[in-house]
Amino acid sequence: MKITLIRPPAYSSGLMGAQLVPFLGIAYIGAAAREAGHRVDIVDMCGEDITRTEIIQGRYVAYGMSFSALGDRIKPSEVIGFTCMFSQDWVFHRELIQYVRKLYPESILVAGGEHVSSLPEYCLMDCRELDICVIGEGEDVFVRLLYTLGKKGNLSDVPGLVYRSGKEGVYRSTPRAGRIREIDKIPLPAW
């Protein structure tokens, strides 16, 4: 499958700068997906335009690539993944997911990270454009999700997901996936 993983821009209130550091989580998930045979493109919206800043709503600073530049950078993908680590960033990440949905209405949009893991039903309710939330450590769960999507399997067989099901959009969740115990088997990050 063709996959794009997106690290959104960093945001701050201006009182303190955003942490513009390499984002390991999405790099590890990208590496796991590549090792499983998927074509993965990682877009680090902070790292790919680190000097760009934009004032948002008159009080926040966004660091990194603009949404329109992302539209030029993203390639058509079957699955597009996002990360949201911090709850204070969700409102901005939601806007990004909504923007990408307009560009790629047929893609499956997946989100993970600490905020999403903590409030998956809220994320799905607050952002109707989002299809699936990955809960907890994503390396194994995301690869199992891709395998299941590729063979048109049942999402209920993949532990660690919350998703909408059926025409009514009922939320379904699967049992939480176990923690990764053998961390030496995780592939090195895909930079």
Label the model's feature ranges:
Residues 179-191:
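A short, charged helix-loop
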